[in-house]
C-alpha cells in the first residue's frame, strides 16, 4: 500500500514529545483493566476510520518523509473547503448553487457517457448531491429548488466559483464519487464522506476517557499493515514541527461533529509507535 496514508492522525495519538511513557488518561492507569474496553472492541468500533484513512482519500504533503507527496490538498481538506463555502451561501440560494455545480460536472462529462436525456441525468445527479452534501456538511439544503427564483449570469458564475472545492471534491478526490453518473459504475457501497461519517459516529459513541486509546489503536492498526520498507528513509522531525502537527491533528479531530478529544493524548507505555500519522481535516 502506498505511503499516502501517512500524514497526521496517528500523530495526534502518539504525541512523541517525551510523553510516550505516560498514559492516555487516568482511565489507563492502575484501574486500566477494569475500565478500559478491550483493544479489539475499540478497534472494531473504529473500523470505518481505518477504512477511511487507508482507502478513500488522495495523499497529503508529508513534510516528515524524505519522499515528498506533492499534492497539497487531500480529499478531506477539499471536502472541508466545500462545506465552508456552501455554509456561507444564503440558505435560499444553496439549492441553485448545487444545481450549478451539477451542471458544471455534467458539461465536463463526455457526451458518449450519457444514455438518458441530459435533463433527467441532471435531475438525478442533483438529487444525489442534495442528499450527500446535506449530510456531509451538516447544513440545511432544501430538497427542491424554488424554480421561480431567477439568478443572473454573474451571480451564477459567482456561485460556481464559490463552490469550486465541491466540484473538485466530487470529481477527483474520492473513490468512488458519490454521484453515480450513467455508465460509471459505483462498485463500492460506501463513499469517502459516508465512511468518514461512520468514523465520526463511532468515535462520538466511545466514552471520552477512551478516545485517546481508540485513536491510538487506529494508528497502530495502520502502522502494522504497512510493509516495513515503507518506513525506511524516515527521519525524526524537529520538536516545533511535531508540536505544530499535533496541534493541527487535534484541531481537526475536534472539528468532527464537535467531538471532544483531550488536548493531552499521549500513548500508553505498552505501545511505542513511530511518529507517523494520517490527517483528516474536514467536517463530518
From Swiss-Prot:
InterPro entries listed in its UniProt record: Bifun_inhib/LTP/seed_sf, Bifunc_inhib/LTP/seed_store, Glia_glutenin
Q: Which domain of life is it from?
A: Eukaryota
Record keywords, A-Z: Disulfide bond, Seed storage protein, Signal, Storage protein
Xref: Gene3D superfamilies: Plant lipid-transfer and hydrophobic proteins
Instruction: Briefly state the modifications made to the protein after translation.
Output: Contains disulfide bonds.
Q: Where is the secretion signal located?
A: 1-18
One of the entry's Gene Ontology molecular-function terms is: nutrient reservoir activity
Q: In this record, what's one Pfam family?
A: Gliadin
Q: Which family does it belong to?
A: Belongs to the prolamin family.
Q: What does this protein do?
A: Seed storage protein. Might be integrated via inter-chain disulfide bonds within the glutenin polymer.
Q: What is this protein called?
A: Avenin-like b10
Organism in which the protein naturally occurs = Triticum aestivum
Amino acid at each position: 500500500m502506498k505511503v499516502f496514508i501517512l500524514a497526521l492522525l496517528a500523530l495526534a495519538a502518539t504525541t512523541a514529545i517525551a510523553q510516550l511513557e505516560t498514559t492516555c488518561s487516568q482511565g489507563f492507569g492502575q484501574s486500566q483493566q477494569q475500565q478500559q474496553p478491550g483493544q479489539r472492541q475499540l478497534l472494531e468500533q473504529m473500523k470505518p476510520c481505518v477504512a477511511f484513512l487507508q482507502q478513500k482519500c488522495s495523499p497529503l504533503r508529508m513534510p516528515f518523509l524524505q519522499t515528498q507527496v506533492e499534492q497539497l490538498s487531500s480529499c478531506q481538506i477539499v471536502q472541508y473547503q466545500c462545506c465552508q463555502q456552501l455554509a456561507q451561501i444564503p440558505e435560499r440560494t444553496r439549492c441553485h448553487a448545487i444545481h450549478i455545480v451539477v451542471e458544471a460536472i455534467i458539461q465536463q462529462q463526455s457526451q458518449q457517457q450519457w444514455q438518458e436525456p441530459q435533463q433527467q441525468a441532471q435531475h438525478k445527479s442533483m438529487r444525489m448531491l442534495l442528499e450527500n452534501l446535506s449530510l456531509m456538511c451538516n447544513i440545511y439544503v432544501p430538497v427542491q429548488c424554488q424554480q421561480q427564483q431567477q439568478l443572473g449570469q454573474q451571480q451564477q458564475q459567482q456561485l460556481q466559483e464559490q463552490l469550486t472545492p465541491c466540484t473538485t471534491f466530487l470529481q477527483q478526490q474520492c473513490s468512488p464519487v458519490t454521484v453515480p453518473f450513467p455508465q460509471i459504475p459505483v462498485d463500492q457501497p460506501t463513499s469517502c464522506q459516508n465512511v468518514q461519517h461512520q468514523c465520526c459516529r463511532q468515535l462520538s459513541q466511545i466514552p471520552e476517557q477512551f478516545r485517546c486509546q481508540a485513536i491510538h489503536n487506529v494508528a497502530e492498526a495502520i502502522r502494522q499493515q504497512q510493509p516495513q520498507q515503507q518506513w525506511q528513509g524516515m527521519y525524526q522531525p524537529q520538536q516545533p514541527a511535531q508540536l505544530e502537527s499535533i496541534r493541527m491533528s487535534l484541531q481537526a479531530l475536534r472539528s468532527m461533529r464537535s467531538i471532544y478529544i483531550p488536548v493531552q493524548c499521549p500513548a500508553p507505555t505498552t505501545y511505542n509507535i513511530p511518529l507517523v500519522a494520517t490527517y483528516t481535516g474536514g467536517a463530518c
